Amino acid sequence: MAEHNELGKAGENAAVAYLEEHGYLIRHRNWRKGHFELDIVAAKENELVIVEVKTRSNTLFAQPEEAVDLPKIKRTVRAADAYMKLFQIDVPVRFDIITVIGENGNFRIDHIKEAFYPPLF
């Protein structure tokens, strides 16, 4: 596995552990259907939480959350809509970003709640 893939997987594992420690129920990880993809689907207090995870070894060039641009937001919203239809979920949904910065399990985690709202298409 490529080094950046290993870092991404470790970051996602750290994000899941963080969410569980903070009372979130993890419904799915790396959910895919067709061309739709969601990193983490969680639930807490009757709310569905869609989490985009961005992992970087450092922030020399950019902050990880800057990688979540408008096209990525639109894809994530469409994927969340497909997920909710497939599983017949009718609760409020929130879109969060978790940034994971560091290496070798020594991570700094930042949870950005309500990081974005569904855009008007």
UniProtKB/Swiss-Prot annotation:
Pfam families linked: UPF0102
Gene3D superfamilies: 3.40.1350.10
GO function term, MF aspect, one: nucleic acid binding
Top-rank taxon: Bacteria
InterPro entries: Restrct_endonuc-II-like, tRNA_endonuc-like_dom_sf, UPF0102_YraN-like
Family membership: Belongs to the UPF0102 family.
Name of the featured protein: UPF0102 protein BT_2236
